Amino acid sequence: MEVEFSRENFLLPEMKYEYLDHTADVQIHGWGSSLKEAFEQCGVAMFGYMTELDYVSVEQCFEIEAHGDDLESLLFHFLDELLFLFSAEPYLVCKKLEITKFDVENFEISCHCYGEPFELGKHPQGTEVKAITYSAMQIIQDVEASNYEVFVIIDI
């Protein structure tokens, strides 16, 4: 669902992710000072693997929702919803994700996804992401140090 947003005071967050080699696939490692931020970083990293985010403008905002039975399935379904947003109309490639609801008791996420429709002439084509996997998925929470990390393997 498309939502209204204001470009005033619109800031992009610091990049807190990396890509790790994995046999025939790629592992995304996202981190942050909260679990919410680590999830957001992991989602942006997935888009960054599909195209160079420097070429993406923030023209539209869509809202997605994801539900799970535990944190791992919530992360899986969150990334799967983002992949669907890219793979079907509006073919949105996101430069910023803002989770507006992060309910870890009921395992629900609502997220504003900022970006624009993917265009071959404008956006360099990266590697196609076929699917999200549970393989070697990790969610690490160090509450005392305010350090949260997620590791997800995406099928390419």
Swiss-Prot record:
Q: Which domain of life is it from?
A: Eukaryota
Keyword tRNA processing attached: yes
| One Pfam family, short name | Archease
Q: Which UniProt keywords apply?
A: Calcium, Metal-binding, tRNA processing
As for what it does, the entry says: Component of the tRNA-splicing ligase complex required to facilitate the enzymatic turnover of catalytic subunit RtcB. Plays an important role in a RNA repair and splicing pathway which controls axon regeneration in response to peripheral (PNS) and central nervous system (CNS) injury, by activating splicing of Xbp1 to promote axon regeneration in response to axotomy.
What the record says about family reads: Belongs to the archease family.
Q: List the disulfide bonds.
A: none
Q: What gene is it encoded by?
A: Archease
Phenotype caused by lack of the gene: Larval lethal. Severed axons in RNAi-mediated knockdown class III dendritic arborization (da) neurons of larvae, display decreased regeneration. RNAi-mediated knockdown in larval class IV da neurons glial cells also impairs axon regeneration.
Q: What is this protein called?
A: Protein archease-like
Positions in coiled-coil regions: none
Residues given in the record as Ca(2+) binding sites: 25, 155-156
Task: List the GO biological process terms.
Answer: positive regulation of axon regeneration; tRNA processing
The record's GO CC annotations read:
tRNA-splicing ligase complex
Question: What lineage, starting at the top, does this entry show?
Answer: Eukaryota, Metazoa, Ecdysozoa, Arthropoda, Hexapoda
Give GO terms: molecular function aspect only.
metal ion binding
User: What InterPro entries has UniProt attached to this entry?
Assistant: Archease, Archease_dom, Archease_dom_sf
